[in-house]
């Protein structure tokens, strides 16, 4: 089986700043969320966990799986989508004509911002990870957990559900929510 989980809350989540690849750690609420999720989902078996190397995801995985003996591996293909020059911007939705907003409102019309990542790049790297790392293990009967980020997780969820780009954000999950994909 394959499960996916979004990291716990950070201070930047709380003030609506775009995090992207900026390495923001969990805050106390995020750590508590990860511990509570660990209790809530304690009956789900995992053989291995793959996490984004960014601190907020890796720490979520470690707290969530504490005491379960599940190895946590990081992989660069699981980092969050790059938001370029808009990382760290607070409340981008309030900025009139801010180009990053089309990413969230009309993803099919999104034009990659300076220093950012395109949907094609995101889907290529996460798809490669799923095809080359995860599926061979799932096909051998292993239960795998991926701990990542909003957009990165949505790309994997879209791959499994066949979601068109205009519905990309339909796969968005809450912080520390676990979703079974297969």
Regions found by a protein language model. Give the residues of each.
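Generic beta-sheet signal
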Residues: 2, 140-150
